[in-house]
């Protein structure tokens, strides 16, 4: 397993466990997170305010169907299912593009489709 693959797996595992510290440990201090046409945040502190959302209950079910690595770019494709506190379920497919720097995630671009 490459260092980049290990970091991306730790990042995904942090979301599965709703472990904010584990997620943040995978990021550079100046990380950029983009969801095209919807959202962009810069910096680890800002990133932290958008993870482990209080509007959900329990742990999300995250399945990674495919991982692709090339140089310092890593792509993960999969699905997420999570229960909301209002009783509804969020179900989406994702494609996350990770730009890596010095063994950490420097930029994340997330493409999300609600099912």
Predicted regions and their residues:
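Short glycine-rich loop/turn motifs that provide flexible caps or phosphate-binding loops at active sites
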Residues: 13, 42, 86
